[in-house]
UniProtKB/Swiss-Prot annotation:
The lineage of its organism: Bacteria, Bacillati, Bacillota, Bacilli, Bacillales. Changing residue 204 to A: Reduced kinase activity and loss of phosphorylase activity. InterPro entries: HPr(Ser)_kin/Pase, Hpr_kin/Pase_C, Hpr_kin/Pase_Hpr_N, P-loop_NTPase, Ser_kin/Pase_Hpr-like_N_sf. It catalyses: [HPr protein]-L-serine + ATP = [HPr protein]-O-phospho-L-serine + ADP + H(+); [HPr protein]-O-phospho-L-serine + phosphate + H(+) = [HPr protein]-L-serine + diphosphate. This is HPr kinase/phosphorylase. It comes from Bacillus subtilis (strain 168). Its EC number is 2.7.11.-, 2.7.4.-.
């Protein structure tokens, strides 16, 4: 998991630092935010102190109604030794009690002109993206008709050559050789290329080529959600391969199950066309049109009609 510090959030959203500068390198370990309304009312039993605290108009207007002594106690309790930051929205004025408590405990107090809900949404999206679980897989990621296809297989099976043919057919390369994958949601995997090899494709006998330079900016993209895995393997004579497409194999990446197709490789098979059609067929299945199921249903009807005639 990547490290995110308060300083990163401050720079990303151009937040104004009010006080507690010594704590700007505190780590942020979770994407969940806290709006400590009930804590300002005095209930700290389940206070999530390790989260970024977000104060809006509602919390601060209630805070202003508290007696002076309670104001100091509430802010001292909000500013703990593990609280990454306290952020105020709408350019609200900062209570002096909060400034004093933040300087005392080294908790950064930041301010944003954004509305509270808008700021909360943007912060959550940023933190979920940066704190998402990550892994790296040997393969090629291509955007085919809007479907993120991760092509895997043993070294030398023809992954990069297939990707090159797909790019020539108008599809977009995301990553070759090494695909960095992060799980942004419970069932969302997003892949991208390491910065060092972004837009590059390695073809044996030809060397390294820059896809964006050769084919233009429309032939590449920086990241893509992975929807299906296509595993290329050398054809084995005695092995049984799926010929109808009724059985759906899956592959687990991090904590997400992804549909996986195994495509046997042998001379004369146009892998680029097969993968292209597989991506289109996958989209049709998700739209409720399954050719294999339609065929088996028709076959069952024909068999049933034949039995009735007998």
């Amino acid at each position: 998991m990547a490290k995110v510090r308060t300083k990163d959030v401050m720079e990303q959203f151009n937040l104004e630092l009010i006080s507690g500068e010594e704590g700007i390198n505190r780590p942020i370990t979770m994407s969940d935010l806290s709006r400590p309304g009930i804590e300002i009312a005095g209930y700290f039993t389940y206070y999530p102190r390790e989260r970024v605290q977000l104060l809006g108009k509602t919390e601060l207007s209630f805070f202003e109604q508290l007696p002076e002594e309670e104001k100091k106690q509430r802010m001292d309790s909000l500013c703990t030794d593990v609280t990454p930051a306290i952020i105020l929205s709408r350019d609200m004025p900062i209570p002096q009690e909060l400034i004093d408590a933040s300087e005392k405990n080294g908790v950064p107090v930041l301010r944003s002109p954004l509305k509270t809900t808008r700021l909360s949404s943007r912060l959550t999206n940023f933190l979920e993206s940066r704190l998402a679980p990550t892994t790296a897989i040997h393969g090629v990621l291509v955007d085919i008709y809007g479907v993120g296809v991760l092509i895997t297989g043993k070294s030398g099976v023809g992954k990069s050559e297939t990707a090159l043919e797909l790019v020539k057919r108008g599809h977009r390369l995301v990553a070759d050789d090494c695909v960095e994958i992060r799980q942004e949601d419970q069932d969302t995997l997003v892949g991208n290329a390491p910065e060092l090899i972004e837009h590059l494709l390695e073809i044996r006998g030809l060397g390294i080529i820059n896809v964006m330079t050769l084919f233009g900016a429309g032939a590449v993209r920086s990241n893509k959600r992975i929807t299906i895995v296509m595993n290329l393997e050398l054809w084995e004579q005695g092995k049984q391969y799926d010929r109808l497409g009724l059985e759906e194999e899956t592959m687990k990446i991090i904590d997400t199950e992804i549909t996986k197709l195994t495509i046997p490789v042998r001379p004369g098979r146009n892998l680029a066309v097969i993968i292209e059609v597989a991506a289109m067929n996958f989209r049709l299945k998700r739209m409720g049109l399954n050719a294999a199921e339609q065929f088996t249903n028709k076959l069952a009807d024909v068999i049933e009609d034949g039995e009735q005639e007998e």
